[in-house]
Structure formats: structure tokens, C-alpha cells
Amino acid sequence: MPRRSIWKGSFVDAFLLRMKKKRDLLFNRKIWSRRSSILPEFVDCFVRIYNGKTFVRCKITEGKVGHKFGEFAFTRKRRPSRTNIGPGRKRGKK
């Protein structure tokens, strides 16, 4: 995926920029903007990121700075591969 131009800077929603100045408002805050970048001012805050159905709680650490909020709230369920079929079942059609 192409990266955003350096001269444009990282994208952050306007309401998150307002929260940047008041850190106490950001604790345990609901965030719908999955496309916004995580800024260094958000480190050590807990936020709840919307995944399309529920809000996923996430702690912002230094390693997450520069990434997008949506990278840490998965939108799809993980399903294990069905390699083992139980005894008594037959594979495929005859």
C-alpha cells in the first residue's frame, strides 16, 4: 500500500487533536476513527476502538506510535483451520 507523502504529515481526526492538549479527556475514550494515526502524546492512555460491532480496549504504548488505531482492533473473527475432522466423519463426497 502506498505511504502518505511526508510533506502532508500523518492524518489525525480533528477531535483527537483537541484531545491531545487535554490528556485526562483521552483516558478510556471511545474512538470511531480507525484511520487516524497514533501520536506520541497518546502514550500510556487506554482507548476503546470501534471494530464495527463493539469497542475493543487498547493501551497505547511507544511501539504503537505512528500506526493507525484500526490496526489494533480486528474486524474479523479468527477461525481455526479444519484440518482435523473427528472420528466417524468422512471427508469429501463419494
UniProtKB/Swiss-Prot annotation:
A Pfam family reported for this protein in Swiss-Prot or TrEMBL: Ribosomal_S19
Keywords: Mitochondrion, Ribonucleoprotein, Ribosomal protein
GO biological process terms held by the UniProt record: ribosomal small subunit assembly; translation
Claim: Mitochondrion is one of the keywords in the record: yes
Cell location: Mitochondrion
Family the entry assigns: Belongs to the universal ribosomal protein uS19 family.
Gene Ontology annotations for the cellular component aspect, listed alphabetically: mitochondrial small ribosomal subunit
This protein's encoding gene: RPS19
Coiled-coil regions listed: none
Name this polypeptide is given: Small ribosomal subunit protein uS19m
Database matches in InterPro entries: Ribosomal_uS19 (IPR002222), Ribosomal_uS19_bac-type (IPR005732), Ribosomal_uS19_CS (IPR020934), Ribosomal_uS19_SF (IPR023575)
Keyword Mitochondrion among UniProt keywords: yes
Main location: mitochondrion
GO molecular function, one term: RNA binding
